[in-house]
Amino acid sequence: MSASVAEPPPALSRKAEFKAAKAELLARFKSANHVTPLMHALSRATDDALRSLWQECGLPATLALVAVGGFGRGELSPHSDVDILVLLPDAHASELDERIERFIGMAWDLGLEIGSSVRTVDQCIEEASHDVTVQTSLLEARRIVGSTALFERFMLRYREALDARAFFQAKVLEMRQRHAKFQNTPYSLEPNVKESPGGLRDLQTILWIARAAGFGSSWRELDTRGLITDREARELRRNEGFLKTLRARLHVIAGRRQDILVFDLQTQAAESFGYQPTSAKRASEQLMRRYYWAAKAVTQLATILIQNIEAQLFPATSGVTRVLSPGRFVEKQGMLEIAADDVFERHPDAILEAFLLYEATRGVKGLSARTLRALYNSRDVMNNAWRRDPRNRHTFMQILQQPEGITHAFRLMNQTSVLGRYLLNFRRIVGQMQHDLYHVYTVDQHILMVLRNIRRFAVAEHAHEYPFCSQLIVNFERPWVLYVAALFHDIAKGRGGDHSALGMADARRFCREHGIEGDDAALVVWLVQHHLTMSQVAQKQDTSDPVVIKRFAELVGSERRLTALYLLTVADIRGTSPKVWNTWKGKLLEDLYRATLAVLGGAQPDAHSELKTRQEEALALLRLETVPPDAHRALWDQLDVGYFLRHDAADIAWQTRVLYRHVAADTAIVRARPSPVGDALQVLVYVKDRSDLFAGICAYFDRNGLSVLDARVNTTRHGYALDNFIVTQTEHDVQYRDIANLVEQQLAARLAESAPLPEPSKGRLSRLSRTFPITPRVDLRADERGQYYILSVSANDRPGLLYSIARVLAEHRVGVHAARINTLGERVEDVFMLDGTGLSDNRLQIQVETELLRAIAV
């Protein structure tokens, strides 16, 4: 007898057929530029499958199956939820419930992500009356199968109950709340293509409120209604098409619903659009720039449309409040409104005047839809002649020099694309992502964030944030010079070459064209050239060395330049990412500022006088602590000049008070306290020195989730290590006072052990670091005096990295004299001062460098 092949179960057969049909549609989409046909085809295929299941389950003709939400629009992304409503007549047999459950279960078995509700007409209206999400999903309801009469009765009741004004207010509030979750910016590193500001949800919201108001349900209908122009309708369709296509491609690449443009998928998504990497830009950076421009346009046009719809739904009871510029601008209900639609065509210089008035006029909270539209449609007016017009140059400088409102004005100029059309080089960096692992903003947003930070120094209500910066800027004449420097400090990013040098040339040209002369022009250009210098000196050089301070003072040359560079540096670091700035970096910069200011004021950077001053200050503090006179000598006699220069008087006094009775201790002494500088723990270690000591301490910190910010390593004349560490806990909301005792006990016990150094843990990289790894670099060279060797390490940050470095050095018996741990978001740029013994051997140098590269490799 011949064996027969068993038929697959009907459910499996249906699922296989549906999956094959969907796969065929997706295969066609891969070579298509437009996604709308795919979305409609997926919706039709889903309709057909659901109709078939409905009939198979024997559901009566008195019920109706209704598509809602995006499915109701007839648009399905490859892995979108399929939202359905089973509409029941007021009275129905209870046995229907079992059939409906079977229908929904079979839909799930088919592979559909079903979102279902089962309601009567009355229940639908009741739910919609107190839940705007339900009300919205029903707005685009579409019958798939079942009773037409029941569906039409439902839609009639729904429209009768719909209050267009209340719906508008609810959806606008919902949109504001949604935007707030994304920090009110489309410029996220990993934007949500659907939900982020400028995403698909904004476009859908506009069409929802327009449909509810009876104004139309497509961009063409809104154009016909006069709510948007032909040009705006084209822009909306173009950007909507791009966002829909991007979302669908994310779904296909991920093989599931995926609306967030995560790092891991950005390169594949870019390649699916045909972007190719160049020497200057990754493919992903090109895609992200396209996305940011689309989101920016959507945000701009959405603002115009919402204001226009609001004006029709809520006709103004009052007209013009006051004339702000005769024949050009008026204030209308708190908004800056053009006096006529062709103002910018007749008076191109009114374009920048609009922002000056917005900035300088109390009570004006924004630009009206009419003004925004006129700006949007005046792009051709903003040409070379407009940029060269002396009136515009004068107005631009006035905007920079106003006492308040500068940040808001520049943000609005960027949102409306006016800033990029006035400064063409600024336009080149709009939407340009920086995959350097520590900037979390696009270049244009970073620049405006730096401008905002400098402005906040000068605002009294923010003086508590950075008191020293606020104190300095109060006495800084013509602070607008700093704003110009902020605008240009990174304007040349992404062009290739040294962005500081290229930006210098742009800044010099701007100053020449805008009448900035003499010392002010020289300061702007110098700040752009050296905007990274102070940070590098403070974080990577030994600022206890008088030679370093003297060299930096010679570069700066004057107190005004020093203050300007300090303020720009603090604002710049704070403008890269919320994670990069910390109080320790603030202390390093402030210490460098004060030391340099003393030299500029005539003080000689003399090690002997500095040593004497610090010792006297430390002794005064010890007397307050009731430490016996001369008790400090036993310890201080064992310390070299370098120790006193590398520690301030407060640290010297604390360490002396802890150690003066234990100068010849047999066991390790470990003391910890909350850092006086800020949110960190200061750890003192005093123990007989050995070659693996630094590595052993780093191993303990690594195993216990403590990150080292700074290490100052000293060896006494009688062979003890006196090491000082500043560490932070990776967990949030840690109370350092609570963990100080635990660190003291555990670290002392660890140092008492004679166990070999453990293997470093290769901690996991973040997704950002995995997607955009940097090439690790190691540079080992003798310092200028030949006293120490300077080791510079640049790598992706990860747990265990510092210990991996320390272990290699310990294995080669290379002593660490000092360490500056500089974490910049997802990357580190660490600098170590090493004892030079043995490193003069080139073979050892090469071996150490090679092993370090291997240890820090991703």
UniProtKB/Swiss-Prot annotation:
Residue ranges constituting the HD domain according to the UniProt record: 443-565
Cofactor(s) annotated in UniProt: Mg(2+)
Pfam families xref list: GlnD_UR_UTase, HD, NTP_transf_2
Annotated spans, Uridylyltransferase: 1-324
Region (Uridylyl-removing): 325-681
The keyword Nucleus is assigned to this record: no
Catalytic activity, reaction form: [protein-PII]-L-tyrosine + UTP = [protein-PII]-uridylyl-L-tyrosine + diphosphate; [protein-PII]-uridylyl-L-tyrosine + H2O = [protein-PII]-L-tyrosine + UMP + H(+)
UniProt similarity note: Belongs to the GlnD family.
Domain characteristics, as noted in the entry: Has four distinct domains: an N-terminal nucleotidyltransferase (NT) domain responsible for UTase activity, a central HD domain that encodes UR activity, and two C-terminal ACT domains that seem to have a role in glutamine sensing.
Name of the protein in question: Bifunctional uridylyltransferase/uridylyl-removing enzyme
Organism per entry: Burkholderia mallei (strain ATCC 23344)
Taxonomic lineage of the native organism: Bacteria, Pseudomonadati, Pseudomonadota, Betaproteobacteria, Burkholderiales
Encoding gene (name): glnD
